[in-house]
Design a protein with these regions (language model features):
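Glycine-rich, phosphate-binding/catalytic loops in enzymes
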Residues: 2-7, 43, 81-83, 134-139, ...
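His/acidic metal-ligating clusters that form di-metal
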Residues: 56, 63, 90-123
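A solvent-exposed, charged loop/short amphipathic helix patch at secondary-structure junctions
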Residues: 74-92
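Short amphipathic alpha-helical segments and helix-helix/interface helices
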Residues: 2-4, 23, 98, 102-107, ...
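Metal-dependent phosphoester-hydrolase catalytic domains
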Residues: 107-118, 124-229
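Structured beta-strand-rich core segments of catalytic domains in phosphoester-bond hydrolases
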Residues: 1-72
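A short secondary-structure junction signal
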Residues: 65, 74-79, 129-132
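Soluble or luminal CAZymes and related metallo-dependent hydrolases
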Residues: 45-48, 89-102, 140-141, 216
Length: 229
């Protein structure tokens, strides 16, 4: 029997959240809370919150942004959900959320493109880089979130960059809605990046057929390794 060394997790961080869906960062290095993000009422609420944490590795700050955008087809707090859905309210709400999150994190740094930044989570949105699979119209609102990131930030889509021309679903269906983004200086340190698809991570529908409930999860994990020397 062989044994592998175990990394002891000494530090943890919970981002801003308004409900029971926070994001958590664990680390063997001390974590600084830079900002917990929940948005502003009445029209800029970040539904599940977001966080901006920072660690220092070998003397270099690493900025970590976590998020989980609004999941529904209608807008958050929509009074008439059917009408909101017909107007693509959910897509437009997620577009507002990502602009709010980016403007309060990476956009606060004029030289962010030369710094070490990552942003990750369940975006509940599809990317134009995968549109050869989806075949959506060019102006489809389902592409708004990642269009904003591509047009207004220095972030690089890690999975798309490391697996050009390939499609890797992150759900039980054929949807890539979970992403890891990095700025180029951090992207250059990546040694491995993949969506983990195996017998354990395969989403299996709950026997009780609970709505949208899968074991072990309705999302597949994304693994990204970095050489931070």
């Amino acid at each position: 029997m062989s044994w592998r060394p175990v990394t002891v997790i000494k530090y943890w961080y919970v981002g801003g959240h308004r409900d029971n869906f926070p994001q958590v960062v664990t680390s063997k290095y001390p974590i600084e809370n830079v900002r917990r993000i929940v948005g502003q009422a009445p029209d800029s609420i970040v539904s599940h919150g977001a966080g901006w944490a920072r660690i220092v590795k070998n003397g270099r700050p690493v900025n970590i942004v976590t998020l989980h955008t609004w999941p529904q087809a209608y807008a958050f707090q929509a009074v008439d959900r059917d009408a909101s859905k017909a107007e693509h309210g959910g897509d437009r709400y997620r577009r507002m959320e990502i602009e709010y999150i980016c403007s309060h994190t990476i956009a606060t740094q004029s030289d962010a493109g030369q710094q070490l930044w990552m942003m990750m989570g369940d975006f509940n949105s599809r990317s134009r880089r995968d549109n050869r699979v989806y075949n959506y119209p060019d102006d489809d609102t389902r592409l708004l979130v990642h269009d904003y990131i591509a047009e207004h930030t220095p972030y690089v889509d890690v999975i798309a960059e490391k697996h050009p021309g390939e499609f890797h679903t992150t759900t039980h269906g054929q949807s890539r809605i979970d992403f890891v983004y990095c700025t180029q200086p951090l992207c250059e340190r990546i040694t491995r990046a993949e969506v983990i698809a195996d017998d354990f991570t395969e989403p299996v529908r709950d026997p009780g057929k609970l709505s949208n409930f899968y074991h072990p999860s309705d999302h597949r994990p994304i693994l990204v390794d970095f050489d931070m020397k």
